[in-house]
């Protein structure tokens, strides 16, 4: 999985999802996952983590509570008071995928031979606010 929104809680990664997704149905059949999180900020600072672990699917009130915390990480509290936003998020995100981290692998392209070659050669496009908004 490559989550758009997530929250780390202790040694777990929590990801909101819907019961209507292929992801949800696949995780019910096989409750394990790999999660890729890109923590790059800009330019050549290309870093991330790969998390592997067993999955627990959370429902009902606990899922609503966790998913609300995840949503508040990314949107202002006032957004959740807006009927359109809150109905979309609450209807769409009715399950929480909790990945219990069994293995964590970090990566850093900046320090790799490929990253150094690209950097020295000037082959990266600069990442800036203008490009990020396109």
Kindly label every feature range from the protein language model.
Residues 1-19, 27, 34-38, 50:
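Short beta-strand segments
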Residues 5, 25, 41, 87-89:
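Short secondary-structure boundary/capping segments
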């Amino acid at each position: 999985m490559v989550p758009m929104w997530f929250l780390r809680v202790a040694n777990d990664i929590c990801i909101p999802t819907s019961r209507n997704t292929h992801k949800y149905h696949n995780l019910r059949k096989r409750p394990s996952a790999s999660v890729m999180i890109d923590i790059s900020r800009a330019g050549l600072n290309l870093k991330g983590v790969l998390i592997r672990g067993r999955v627990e699917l959370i429902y009902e009130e606990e899922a609503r509570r966790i998913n609300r915390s995840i949503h508040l990480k990314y949107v202002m509290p006032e957004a959740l008071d807006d009927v359109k936003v809150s109905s979309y998020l609450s209807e769409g995100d009715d399950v929480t995928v909790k990945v219990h981290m069994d293995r964590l692998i970090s990566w850093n392209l900046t320090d790799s031979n490929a990253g150094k070659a690209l950097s020295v050669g000037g082959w990266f496009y600069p990442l800036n606010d203008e490009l990020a908004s396109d």
